[in-house]
């Protein structure tokens, strides 16, 4: 045991490892000695800009020299889908379109940035915008120039699947970017996101919290089941899911009804996992056929389906999902919410930091921001949601269904999700070449004769 000595004016010393160590005076609030914390230290201030010895983490990769924390907070409205039958061919089938109350919230930095995009009359209010917004400042007419945006073109049948949760979200980001609206009046692309955080090389997910509440009754029994999964529990087809960076792409295949077990254009997956992009009106099937049965659908004799996959209410319940009952079926309290918490990257290899902008990138383009060079759209966790009912179609496995309708001035949400998320950016590649070269080339501006 170390020898201790007391000197005048309350100084304490302890002898260990061959020398006397000066100890600070005991604080009277505590029984045992505690180290006095210094809130503002010079070294901590310097390390916020550059840490010469950042150390490593479990897989023996270097930590970034400097970091910045980003926080998101907002609300997600899980609404019923909309249909926009613009042309005459599709208009007659609008009454035969059905959808299911399912949703999928992916925890990745890309979609959180999309959720915090600008609020305009065509981007967020009242539900999702069905098509990509186009902003152009080179037109002769004032109404066609920024910040005005064009609406989706006619003679198209745009739609959005429930995986595009950011279209129904209002998210705040801290720290704020005061120039975001002026730089990106439309939805941000991967290139825009890379340039927005061009000074950072790495990023990591710290924590995300969800609080889900069912808001709409669907019969006498209609709880909303929610299940948080590590990564993407079901297969995600990134290679064909997005066109123009964020717009979903469809495929044509057989109807998901018992009887048509073969395929016409492409094999379909399990019935409960497929969300109809353009749901068919299937006829009664009496025999098993070797080809997909013709169904009435928009501009096609087959059904159009999305690559996205979802879980039914029964599947989520069988996997142990939480239930949230809507008001009227249970009194509203804290236990009325489904609480989910996701921490870290969910990576068993211990890969804490992920690539935001690849090293050595001086001109950020879409090609640099796509996988595998950038991991901006990497899914760390996925929250699957579905509402059950006592009256449902057999192949929907207890999931509530509804008829798709044209847009109205109000949206119909069946669940609300409160979200809080914390991310962190880091870099190991500053100073950039332009940090020095820009100053050298502009330092004499205005002073030369």
Curated annotation (Swiss-Prot):
Region DNA-binding, residue ranges: 1-43
Keyword Ion transport in annotation: no
Main location: host cell
Annotated region (Nuclear localization signals), positions in chain: 6-47
Protein family: Belongs to the gyrovirus capsid protein family.
Assembly and binders: Homomultimer (Potential). Interacts with Rep; this interaction relocates Rep into the nucleus.
Name of the protein in its database record: Capsid protein
Originating species: Chicken anemia virus (isolate Australia/CAU269-7/2000)
Gene field: VP1
């Amino acid at each position: 045991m170390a020898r201790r000595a007391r000197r005048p004016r309350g100084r304490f010393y302890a002898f260990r490892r061959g020398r006397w160590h000066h100890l600070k005076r005991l604080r009277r609030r505590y029984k045992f000695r505690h180290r006095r914390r210094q809130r503002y230290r010079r070294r901590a201030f310097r390390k916020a800009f550059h840490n010469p010895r950042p150390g490593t983490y479990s897989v023996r990769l270097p930590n970034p020299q400097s970091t910045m924390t980003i926080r998101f907070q907002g609300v997600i409205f899980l609404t019923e889908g909309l249909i926009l039958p613009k042309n005459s061919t599709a208009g007659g089938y609008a009454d035969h379109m059905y959808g299911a109350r399912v949703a999928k919230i992916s925890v990745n930095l890309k979609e959180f940035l999309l959720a915090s995009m600008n609020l305009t009359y065509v981007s967020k209010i009242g539900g999702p915008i069905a098509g990509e917004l186009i902003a152009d400042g080179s037109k002769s007419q004032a109404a066609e120039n920024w910040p005005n945006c064009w609406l989706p073109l006619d003679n198209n049948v745009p739609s959005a699947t429930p995986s595009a949760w950011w279209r129904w979200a209002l998210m705040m980001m801290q720290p704020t970017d005061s120039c975001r609206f002026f730089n990106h009046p439309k939805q941000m692309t991967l290139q825009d996101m890379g340039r927005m955080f061009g000074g950072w090389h790495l990023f990591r997910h710290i924590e995300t919290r969800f609080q889900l509440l069912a808001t709409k009754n669907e019969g006498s029994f209609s709880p909303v089941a929610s299940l948080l999964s590590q990564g993407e529990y079901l297969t995600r087809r990134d290679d064909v899911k997005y066109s123009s960076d964020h717009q979903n792409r469809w495929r044509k295949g057989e109807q998901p009804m018992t009887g048509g077990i073969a395929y016409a254009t492409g094999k379909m997956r399990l019935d409960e996992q497929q969300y109809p992009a353009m749901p068919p009106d299937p006829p009664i099937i009496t025999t098993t056929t070797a080809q997909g049965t013709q169904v009435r659908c928009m501009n096609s004799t087959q059904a159009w389906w999305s690559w996205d996959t979802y879980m039914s209410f029964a599947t989520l319940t069988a996997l142990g999902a939480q239930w949230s009952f809507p008001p009227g079926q249970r009194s509203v309290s804290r236990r009325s919410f489904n609480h989910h918490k996701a921490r870290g990257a969910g990576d068993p290899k211990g890969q804490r930091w992920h690539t935001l902008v690849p090293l050595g990138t001086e001109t950020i383009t879409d090609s640099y921001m796509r996988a595998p060079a950038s991991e901006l759209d990497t899914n760390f966790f996925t929250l699957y949601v579905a509402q059950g009912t006592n009256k449902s179609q057999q192949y929907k496995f207890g999931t509530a269904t509804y008829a798709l309708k044209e847009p109205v001035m109000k949206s119909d949400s069946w669940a609300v999700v409160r979200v809080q998320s914390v991310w962190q950016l880091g870099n190991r590649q500053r100073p950039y070449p332009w940090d020095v070269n820009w100053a050298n080339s502009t330092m004499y501006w205005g002073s030369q004769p």
